[in-house]
Amino acid sequence: MKKLLAIGILCIMVTAVMSGCVSEKEININNSNKITTNMPVSEKNITKILKYAKNMNLIYYDENGNIVNPYNGDKWKYKVFIDATGQKFLLKNKDDPVPSWAKEKLGDNFKVINVPLTRVIVMSSTEIALMEAINDDGSVIGSVKGIMWGKSYKWYFKDINKSLAEGKIIDVGSSSNPNWDKIIEINPQVIFVYPGYDGDKIIAKCKELGITYVADAEYLENDPLGRCEWVKMFAAFYNKEPEAKRYFEKVEDNCLKVINKTKNCPKVTVAWGYNSQWGCYVPENNSYVAKEIMFYCNGDYIFKDLNGTGSAKINYETFAERAKDADVWVVPSSTAWLSTFKEDNPGYETFKAVKNGRVFCESDDYWQLGLLKTDEVIMDLATILHPEAFKGRKTHFFLKYNIENNTATPFIAK
């Protein structure tokens, strides 16, 4: 499952970002680490909830149907969420009526959900990650009654481990073969599901059984902060807007600080990828991974001329020809999956990054905790690219990889 998730997250749609320039609108970061753009004043909508996420829509209303923004301190009465498949949801507190203006604004095809949710099923550990961000009182994770792949891999969230062991959360099978009898028995208010891959089959079955699903397309976002901003979707379903605001503003602020800290650093060339039994995959130049490298961390990605929004499968010879001269080589996997790395990547010992000890891999918990700690992931990446700017910092998610004995240790910048 971890491998499938890793490949799936790499294969995403993203906004074009080239080294030294910013996609769409020019972005400036002032001394207070706040983003400003050159967009017209009319576009600076004070009621806009989402700054980075593009695959959903979220609107808040007062009781009279006026748009408000709780992230600016406004009081709300109703919420409208439009998921990645275009479904419209009116979210309201249990005792509140459906407002008279609902059909005028939403049409006839919308679903009403009482919030906060108390009984849900999730498809992925990355959904759990964003739920953890707003789980201050335990009620959000407490609402999770079923998880796909629940007992199929190690969990790095202690509360999930405990609830699975105690039977408070049920493993409802894999995403490719869910146990629908268990799912029906749980009778969830909502199943959070990823569209695409196995998710489309789950969506079809939910429609057949009359089970409400919400399509979470965080993994398709074009920016690491766009992925992280899906925390606001979960906040809407749990009335946790204040918690989401505190969490996201902290993550955003830390990420913007990285941009400011690295923008004047000398560029280093970065190879990202490796060869395995599944082939050699590399991020395309418009992928969120390439954006992390080039925009957030001021690196020079070796395949910045490879157009696309996800990942591309290339032959190893093509990869090696460029990677051999890269300053830094990031192997996007953990050592648990790299036992045949030396055999799969012939000639690696001649690579510049190998000779200079600048090969890095991912931590075991990267695919669970990484989304929750988006800012730490970006800070880690910046640290291994520009150690001179982060002296004394110890990494967690990107580890120094010892190819010869397939081990990895935290990197301390000097």
UniProtKB/Swiss-Prot annotation:
Residue ranges occupied by any Fe/B12 periplasmic-binding domain in the UniProt entry: 119-389
Covalent lipid sites (S-archaeol cysteine): C21
Domain of life: Archaea
Membrane topology: Lipid-anchor
GO cellular component, as recorded: plasma membrane
PROSITE patterns xrefs: FE_B12_PBP, PROKAR_LIPOPROTEIN
Classification via SUPFAM superfamilies: Helical backbone' metal receptor
Signal sequence bounds: 1-20
Sorted UniProt keywords: Cell membrane, Lipoprotein, Membrane, Signal
Pfam families, alphabetized: Peripla_BP_2
The keyword Ligase belongs to this UniProt entry's keyword annotation: no
SS bond partners: none
Compartments it resides in: Cell membrane
Protein name: Uncharacterized lipoprotein MJ0878
